[in-house]
Amino acid sequence: MKLILTQEVPGLGSPGDIVEVANGYGRNYLVPRKYAILATKGAERQVEQIKRARSARAVRDLGHAQEIAGQLGGLKVELISRAGKEGRLFGSVTAADVVEAVTAAGGPELDRRRVELTTPIKSLGAYTVAVHLHPEVTASVKLQVKKA
């Protein structure tokens, strides 16, 4: 069965991709959940138009992402959190906490889903946090976690 994906499907593809799947998978899972539509000639032409517009937008987004990466490059962010005597935090620092601290430090607004915490931040100290702004642009933010 030939389908056009309307949403990101792990292991299958991204929106706009034309994929070949088993009939049951397409009919019983992808189409009812609106992850995909049937691949007709009209739908394929529409997808091609959308892909052309998306590629033009990607060029603009790349420039914007590089601009934001430049702003984040020299930014030092302090995060105040409650901690015990040994420096262990009560809870852990989340991506939303990092975004809030970056905004408070005068940095640009970020999407919390773009912030990657490789290891959970559960103690005081200095950390480097990666921010994926674009598939080709990743910025790093220096984060200092201090005791409240």
UniProtKB/Swiss-Prot annotation:
Domain of life: Bacteria
Residue ranges crossing the lipid bilayer per the database entry: none
Pfam families in alphabetical order: Ribosomal_L9_C, Ribosomal_L9_N
An annotated GO cellular component: ribosome
Matches recorded under InterPro entries: Ribosomal_bL9, Ribosomal_bL9/RNase_H1_N, Ribosomal_bL9_bac/chp, Ribosomal_bL9_C, Ribosomal_bL9_C_sf, Ribosomal_bL9_N, Ribosomal_bL9_N_sf
GO annotation terms (biological process): translation
Keywords: Ribonucleoprotein, Ribosomal protein, RNA-binding, rRNA-binding
Keyword rRNA-binding assigned: yes
Signal sequence bounds: none
GO molecular function: rRNA binding; structural constituent of ribosome
Protein purpose: Binds to the 23S rRNA.
Classification via PANTHER family: 50S RIBOSOMAL PROTEIN L9
Family to which this protein belongs: Belongs to the bacterial ribosomal protein bL9 family.
Record-linked NCBIfam families: L9 (TIGR00158)
Protein's name according to its UniProt entry: Large ribosomal subunit protein bL9
